[in-house]
Amino acid sequence: MPDTTSHRTPPPRARWRTTLVTLLTLLGGLAALLVPATQAQAASVTFTTGADRTDQNGNTLQLHGLGIIKVGSTWYGFGEDKTGRTSGDTSFQDITCYSSTDLANWTYRGQALSRQASGDLGPSRIVERPKVIYNASTSTYVMYMHIDSTNYSEAKVGVATSSTPCGPYTYRGSFRPLGNLSRDLGLFQDTDGTAYLLSEDRNNGLRIDKLSADYLSVDSAVAVLGSGGSSGSVEAPAMVKINGMYYVFGSHLTGWSLNDNVYATATSLSGPWSAFRDFAAPGTKTYGSQTANVITVQGTSGTTYIYAGDRWDTSNLGGSKLIWLPLTIRGTTVNLGQYPTWSLDAAAGTWTAGSGIPSEGVHTLKNLSSSMLMDVSNGSTATGAKIIQWPSAGGTNQQWTLTRVADNIYTLKSVKSGLCLDVPSKSTTAGVQLHQWTCNGGTNQQWALDLTGSYTGSSYMLVGVGSGLHIGVAGSTTQGAAVDQELGGSASANSETWTLS
């Protein structure tokens, strides 16, 4: 006789509970189907500078001339597809779109903008530097790009739109902004939602133009930086705003050849703007790269700003390396250190150098040009004693204790006197001789150390956090010459480079 106890009819309340559980289970399953899948987000990811970057299929990322936007917890990256292209043929193929939740692992989503049979997006056309921003008022993603002929005579901007991040985008045409030339470009969206076009105008300089409310056209001119011409213009622009300060980044005009890229600052987009100065170690050509964008990674514990550049390989543009490095930004000083490896926690908004920074503890600093050591004059222990260069003598007045403050920022304390390397009166003037002073934690006693030369070497440039100037010896190889702060530049790179031991 079969056991029938498990088949008893449940009472009415039990039947209702059973039905409710079943219904909730079905609804839960349906909800899971309706919610779009997202990529898993790792707590921390590691970047290896100069390494090949690939997507989920192992294909080299085509994120050249990077455009990037974050939607929810996902970044969407846009780039020029340079696969198979060389400097002899840079004609348009397509604009790619990828997605990532950690900026290290990317999934190819498809072509955001495809080549057409004719017109601006047709064969033998130039389409460069795609930048995307979102217009909340119109619920539209807006892409700007450089549109040109192969001889770069048209110098226009193109505009495309989409209702979704990766598109496909609908091309809406091209124009010269306010009638001006426009080649390399960038976009900036201010905290109030107003958007701006950054545009290289060979006749005048780097333009900042306000976009219309729908972002589809240029409304008015805001500022022009530089004087125009090949020597007075800046291209490949990018911009961020931090605590009311605007920072614009860009490259000198040297074609496919790399150069020491520069930045300027202002508290208003209309200016006045500071003079342009290097943000990476002079002479390194921005560690072999050209500015493409600056990525803002805002998290629960802080905000990291990532310099994104292209290391162009003219024989294989599609294989050009993506050079992404964290920026150190303090006040009006921007510094880009060189880290062979570094880690990013995108959720926290924090980064850590894996290599490329010196160890804490006692070091000597030898000038690359003179081979002399940084020295407290006469072995003095007095506040205000001058800093000079002197042949190695083994004294503790030539030894400095490095203490890391944050990022690649250190203080240097004389082992003999216990006083800190200091810029007198917090001066921001080039040529001021350094001295030692009571340690007080001021930015005039903090130095960003930038690795130069070999990834495994120990040579650094030291940049004053307060002044943005470099520690050097004004090109002198004379015993007893003053150690001062210098403006920097590739011509004086050796006299501003120090080997730690």
Each model region followed by its residue ranges:
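Intrinsically disordered, low-complexity regions enriched in Ser/Pro/Gly/Gln/His and often acidic
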Residues: 6-10, 29, 37-40, 68, ...
